[in-house]
Amino acid sequence: MRHRKSGRQLNRNSSHRQAMFRNMASALIGHEIIKTTLPKAKELRRVVEPLITLAKEDSVANRRLAFARTRNVETVAKLFNELGPRFAQRAGGYTRILKCGFRAGDNAPMAYIELVDRPEVAEAATE
């Protein structure tokens, strides 16, 4: 019985799943929007949101925890220098999932996952 076992398996072993979500979290924090399958996006939300909450308070201990979870120095720097201050007044709900149809090859449901207060690229280019 799988009672009280949270999280999706996604047809991967645990080390593959952990590495995949580390990479996806780094990509989302770096680019602030990524396109992936809907189940992966929903599961990625459970990885990224606690990292942003951790980044709200800048301390050496929190930076080490974030590095232990992402293993990427650039990701940790962006988390604590940009995203932590940006989301300081927001109590959770840092990501948004937008469904965007189905993948051509296997008809898998696709989605964009993005950070909610992401600066618009088009607005920045016109100003």
Swiss-Prot record:
Q: Which PROSITE patterns match?
A: RIBOSOMAL_L17
Q: Report one GO cellular component.
A: cytosolic large ribosomal subunit
- Give the Gene Ontology MF terms in alphabetical order: structural constituent of ribosome
Coiled coil located at which positions?
none
User: Would you identify the family this protein belongs to, as annotated?
Assistant: Belongs to the bacterial ribosomal protein bL17 family.
Subunit structure, briefly? Part of the 50S ribosomal subunit. Contacts protein L32.
Annotated protein name in UniProt: Large ribosomal subunit protein bL17
Specify the taxonomic lineage.
Bacteria, Pseudomonadati, Pseudomonadota, Gammaproteobacteria, Pasteurellales
